[in-house]
Every structure is written in structure tokens, then in C-alpha cells.
Amino acid sequence: MLQPIGDRVIVKVKEEEEKTVGGIVLASNAKQKPTEGEVVAVGEGAYTSNGDKLPMVVKKGDVVLYDKYSGTNVEYEGEKYLVLHEKDILAIEK
């Protein structure tokens, strides 16, 4: 598995539905970019300018929401992931 560095988080992207509620099949270019996923790996945290380490708020297994323009898409061993900075995570699902 990939191990993020610093304040980065690796999220397994939750794929969007192929059909609408009414049963209409969506073309691949009509689907919106996913904005939800499960955290699969967390970096050690960022450091302040004076060397103090900031703890990570998110943890492995959290389901998170993020902006559709955030992060870097990565494919690893056939799976789609997103590498985000923790600050790009908008919310944790409870």
C-alpha cells in the first residue's frame, strides 16, 4: 500500500452511480467527479515553522467529503485513489 508523507491523506474514491434515480443510464462524460471517499492511509502530519508537529485529525477508515477539484488522482494496483492534503478535506462523516 502507498504511504503518504506530511499532511497528505490517501482516499479510496467512492464511484458515482451509473444510473439516475429514475433509471436513466448516464454517459461517462455526464457523471460528476466524486467528492466522497474512505481514508485508507494517513501521513505523519505537518510541521510548524518552529518544528512542532501538528497531529492529523482524520484517521484510516474515516469517510470524508472533499471539493471535486482537490487532490491528485492516482491509480495503484488497479484501484483509483485520491491524494489530498488534510486541509482539503471539508468534513468527516460520523
Swiss-Prot record:
Family recorded in the similarity comment: Belongs to the GroES chaperonin family.
Keyword Chaperone: yes
Main localization (coarse): cytoplasm
PROSITE patterns linked to this entry: CHAPERONINS_CPN10
Lineage: Bacteria, Bacillati, Bacillota, Bacilli, Lactobacillales
Pfam family, one: Cpn10
Protein name (Swiss-Prot/TrEMBL): Co-chaperonin GroES
Keyword terms, alphabetized: Chaperone, Cytoplasm
Cellular localization per UniProt: Cytoplasm
Highest taxon in the source lineage: Bacteria
GO annotations of cellular component type: cytoplasm
GO terms assigned for molecular function: ATP binding; metal ion binding; protein folding chaperone; protein-folding chaperone binding; unfolded protein binding
Gene Ontology biological process terms, A to Z: chaperone cofactor-dependent protein refolding
Name of the coding gene: groES
Known role: Together with the chaperonin GroEL, plays an essential role in assisting protein folding. The GroEL-GroES system forms a nano-cage that allows encapsulation of the non-native substrate proteins and provides a physical environment optimized to promote and accelerate protein folding. GroES binds to the apical surface of the GroEL ring, thereby capping the opening of the GroEL channel.
Subunit structure, as described in the record: Heptamer of 7 subunits arranged in a ring. Interacts with the chaperonin GroEL.
Keyword Chaperone: yes
